[in-house]
Each structure stands twice: as structure tokens, then as C-alpha cells.
Amino acid sequence: MASFKSFLLLALLAIVSEAAPPGHASHGEADSKCPLMVKVLDAVRGIPAANLLVNVFRQTESGKWEQITSGKTTELGEIHNLTTDEQFTEGVYKIEFATKAFWGKLGLSPFHEYVDVVFTANDAGHRHYTIAVLLTPYSFSSTAIVSEPHDDL
């Protein structure tokens, strides 16, 4: 069990690291205007989770969820520029990962229909958020890197 936890920790550290392939800007470089991005790793195959549908919602004052954007992860398991600084205001957000469809395309029958990550954003001033998710058909783990916006160099 301890080795599995160590694996999860190492996988999450790898997924949120600033390392990027040549020609690919990591968060904070060319994407300095990117207030919200996601990184997803397929822990079964040990590769980025490409072509995973992601929907982003903001909670309204009445408590309902309003979809604000959506996208699909790249071959690197990432989505940059999900929203803008102006649109990403203080509030409660939900990122919904369409995991059943993702695993179904691989011939697997997962437990979760969707995986949701719900969080409060910008309550202590404007920040940039990188949400990292590690997926298997029966479990998930998430972490966040919250940072100050970077000035253009």
C-alpha cells in the first residue's frame, strides 16, 4: 500500500512539474495570461490523458451550476486558456471530467460517470490555477497549484 501511495505522489509531482517538451511552453511562460488550466494523467497506461472532455462551471448566486466553457485535453493531457482573467472572477467552480466516455473508448468499464473537482477561486485576490488529475477507471486524485499571475517578460 505504501508503494502505491508513493507511486501516486510521484505521478502527481510529475504531472504538475514545470518540465515541458521542446517547443511547448509550460504554465507561466507563454501562458502567463492563462488563469485556469488542467493537466490529466491516465495512471493505467502511464501517459497523458488525451482527448478527455472537460466542462467548467461557475456556481450562481442561487446555487445552480452555469457552464462557462469546455474543451478537450491535448496529446499532452492539458488544456490551456479555458477562460480569461476577466471571466475567471471570485467564486465557486466545478471542473467536470467526462471519464466514462474516456475509459469507454479504451474498452474499459469505469466506476465514475464523471469526476468533478469543485473549488473556490480568487477569494484571496486574483490567482492562476493549475488543476492536476490522476485517473484510473475506479479512482482519481487531484491537486492544485495556485500561483500569482506572471507579468509578461
From Swiss-Prot:
User: Induced by what?
Assistant: The estrogen ethinylestradiol (EE2) significantly decreases expression in both male and female livers. The environmental contaminants polychlorinated biphenyls (PCBs) result in an increase in gene expression and a delay in metamorphosis.
Sulfocysteine modification sites are: C34
Residues in the signal sequence: 1-19
Q: Which residues are glycosylated?
A: N81
The organism's superkingdom is given as Eukaryota
List the PROSITE patterns hit by this protein, alphabetically: TRANSTHYRETIN_1 (PS00768), TRANSTHYRETIN_2 (PS00769)
Record carries keyword Hydrolase: no
Q: Where in the cell is it found?
A: Secreted
Q: Which GO terms describe its biological process?
A: purine nucleobase metabolic process; response to estrogen; thyroid hormone transport
* Name this protein carries in UniProt: Transthyretin
Where this protein primarily resides, as one coarse class?
A: secreted
Xref: InterPro entries: Thyroxine_BS (IPR023418), Transthyretin/HIU_hydrolase (IPR000895), Transthyretin/HIU_hydrolase_d (IPR023416), Transthyretin/HIU_hydrolase_sf (IPR036817), Transthyretin_CS (IPR023419)
The GO cellular component terms are: extracellular region; extracellular space; protein-containing complex
Other comments on record: A number of compounds can compete with and disrupt triiodothyronine (T3)-binding. Binds the synthetic estrogen diethylstilbestrol (DES) with the same affinity as T3. Phenolic and phenol compounds can also disrupt T3-binding, with brominated derivatives of bisphenol A (e.g. 3,3'5-tribromobisphenol A) having a higher binding affinity than the chlorinated derivatives (e.g. 3,3'5-trichlorobisphenol A), but with the bromophenols showing lower binding affinity than the chlorophenols.
Question: What's the subunit arrangement here?
Answer: Homotetramer. Dimer of dimers. In the homotetramer, subunits assemble around a central channel that can accommodate two ligand molecules. Interacts with rbp4.
Its PTM note reads:
Sulfonation of the reactive cysteine Cys-34 enhances the stability of the native conformation of TTR, avoiding misassembly of the protein leading to amyloid formation.
Q: What's its job? A: Thyroid hormone-binding protein, with a much higher binding affinity for triiodothyronine (T3) than for thyroxine (T4). Probably transports triiodothyronine from the bloodstream to the brain.
Q: Which GO terms describe its molecular function?
A: hormone activity; identical protein binding; thyroid hormone binding
> What is the reported tissue distribution?
Detected in plasma (at protein level). Expressed during metamorphosis in tadpole liver, but not in tadpole brain nor adult liver. Between 1.5 and 3 days of development, also expressed in the mesoderm of the kidney.
State the family it belongs to.
Belongs to the transthyretin family.
Domains: what does the record tell us? The N-terminus strongly influences thyroid hormone-binding properties.
Q: Which residues participate in L-thyroxine binding?
A: K39, E78, S141
> Which keywords are on file for this protein?
Glycoprotein, Hormone, Secreted, Signal, Sulfation, Thyroid hormone, Transport
